[in-house]
Structures are given as C-alpha cells and as structure tokens.
C-alpha cells in the first residue's frame, strides 16, 4: 500500500485514462466479491464526489470485503475500526500521549488518518463515539487539544451497519446520516451468486489475502484527481437543475414523511448524477443519471411517519413514487 500522504506517480492521471481505470475496478473487485456491482459503482461515485458511504446489510454479505477490495484495487492506504459499545472517540481520531523521556505530550494519530477508513458496524457504538467522525467527515481534519490536523487526500469513510432491527444497535443521529453522500443497501446474493461464493471458498479463496486472489491496483490518486476535474466540467442544464429541485421538494410535501430532503441533499443528488454521467462516458447530465442515483443519495435523508412504517411504506418506495410522479424534462 502506498503512503497516504503522497501521490502515486505510477498512474498517468489524464481523464480518458482515468475513466478506463475506474471502469476496470469492477473486474478487479469481482475477483474477491461476487455480484454487488451497484455497490461498487456507488463507492466509485462517492470517491469522485469526495463523499462518504454508508453500507447497510445483514451480517455476512461481504460489506467489509467489498471495501477492502476497493482499497486494494485503487492502491489506497486503508485502515479499519471495529465499532463496539466501549470504543472511545480518541480510539478513532487519535490522542495526546505523554512521553516520559522528553516530558512532553505528542500526538498519536488514530486510524482516521488514512485514505479509506472502514468504520465497521458503526451503529454498534453509542452516539458520542459515532459523532467523533463528524468533524473528520465534514471538515477533513481532526482537532485535538485545539490543534487542527488535516487528513490525507483522498479521504473516504465507508461505514457498515446492520439493519436497526438487530439487537445491540444504536441508530445513527440525523446529523451523522446527513454526512454520508450515499447509503448503499447490500442485498443477500442470488442463488447463482451464492453458489459462486461457495465454489470459490472450496477452491481455496482466502478473503484475508486479496493479493493471492489476484486483486491488483488498477488506478491511483492521480487518476481520481483527473476524474474529479473532468466531473466538475460535466455540463448541467437548467432543466436538469430544476428536475433535481422538483424531486427534492416533492419529498417535503409527501404525506408519508415527517422529514424531506434538504437543499444539501439536492446538492448531493446533482453531484452524484454528474459523476455517474461522466462514468458512463458523457460530458453532460440527463434525467436518467438523476434517476439512477436518487435512491442511494436520498433514502437516508428522509424520515417516514410512524403510521406509514406500520403500513409497510419504505423510504425507497416513497422515492420511487416521487420519481414516477415528477415530470421529466425533455
């Protein structure tokens, strides 16, 4: 793995090469993870938008393996924090440590000082520790004893969580949820995918040794930077901007919701649609780009009424209904 504070000079970093490299991520990650292509795409979109990702799924669906495979294929430094009920904020961000030899305090960086932080089972720790990530995610720095310390670039938090109905979980605060650009749901595999998983393990696949599985770096920070520059130049028409606003405003008027999408959420949807448009080979955004990213970008930014939940309404069903109702620009 590379030093997270340095650029990777081994990659050309021009937009055309960057797109090809990022597209090849799927093939590399598929060497370790069967299926889950939408989640892979979501992680790449988040990197392009300098955003963070929340991965939700039952235990055992390869959430952690997916993030580790992405880090290996991108040649990024990665660290993992297992969130537990007794985890302290300083265990994540770092702390001042007294050195008896010099009689001085020195800063010991926590695992947050990396390119890709895997926050495993983030909803198994109390809100105080969950909130220790807030400044890091929003400001891309950590302040300890009044001194701000910048985090490396790129920096992405990929947090995994179990569904809230599982015992021993603490629902993420709204302020924390809003810091995630995307919420990706990891489904159980199809029958054929599950057969493929078992076959790989029977043939000796070791999820702890991705190099042996053939996962190799195919892109680096220079490619990401070139891609981000190209995404920022992706054209957005006034009609597309209006379409995004109309979708988000419709959530605020939905009778099934107590909380709709904020302007920050609308900004996030436009950003992810631009990244998706660029990834698919266009330099302009179309309505289908907005639709493609609406669910992962918005599902964690709305709140259902209790009576709607009792009737079986879900966040995804509300968003899908809104997408079907809001006029699409021509």
Can you say where each PLM-predicted feature lies in the sequence?
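C-terminal engagement/docking regions of AAA+ P-loop ATPases
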Residues: 2-12, 16, 68, 251-330
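Pre-Walker A (pre-P-loop) alpha-helix and adjacent loop at the N terminus of AAA/AAA+ ATPase modules
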Residues: 15-61, 249
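Conserved alpha-helical scaffold flanking the Walker A/P-loop in AAA+ ATPase domains
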Residues: 42-45, 98-118, 147
């Amino acid at each position: 793995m590379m030093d997270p504070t340095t650029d990777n000079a081994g990659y050309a970093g021009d937009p055309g090469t960057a797109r090809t490299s990022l597209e090849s991520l799927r093939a590399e990650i598929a060497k370790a993870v069967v299926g889950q292509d939408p989640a892979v795409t979501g992680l790449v979109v988040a990197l392009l938008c300098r955003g963070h990702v929340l991965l939700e799924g039952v235990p055992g669906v390869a959430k952690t393996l997916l993030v580790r495979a992405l880090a290996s294929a991108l040649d990024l430094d990665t660290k993992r924090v297992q969130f537990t009920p007794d985890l302290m904020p300083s265990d994540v961000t770092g702390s001042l440590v007294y050195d008896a030899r010099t009689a001085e305090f020195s800063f010991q960086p926590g695992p947050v000082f990396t390119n890709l932080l895997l926050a495993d089972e983030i909803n198994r720790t109390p809100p105080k520790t969950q909130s220790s990530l807030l400044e890091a995610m929003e400001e891309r720095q950590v302040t300890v004893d009044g001194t701000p310390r910048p985090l490396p670039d790129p920096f992405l938090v990929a947090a995994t969580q179990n569904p809230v109905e599982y015992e021993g979980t603490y629902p993420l605060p709204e302020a924390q949820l809003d810091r995630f650009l995307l919420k990706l749901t990891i489904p159980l595999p199809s029958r054929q995918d599950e057969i493929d998983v078992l076959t790989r393990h029977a043939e000796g696949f070791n999820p702890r040794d991705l190099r042996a599985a053939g996962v190799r770096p195919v892109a680096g920070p220079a490619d990401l930077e070139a891609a981000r520059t190209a995404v920022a130049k992706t054209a957005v028409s006034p009609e597309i901007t209006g379409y995004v606003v109309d979708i988000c405003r419709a959530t605020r008027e939905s009778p099934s919701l107590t909380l709709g999408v904020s302007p920050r959420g609308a900004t996030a949807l436009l950003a992810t649609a631009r990244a998706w448009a660029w990834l698919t080979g266009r330099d302009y955004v179309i309505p289908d780009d907005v639709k493609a990213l609406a669910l992962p970008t918005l599902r964690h930014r709305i709140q259902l009424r209790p009576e709607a939940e009792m009737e079986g309404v879900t966040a995804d069903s509300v968003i899908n209904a809104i997408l079907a109702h809001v006029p699409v620009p021509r």
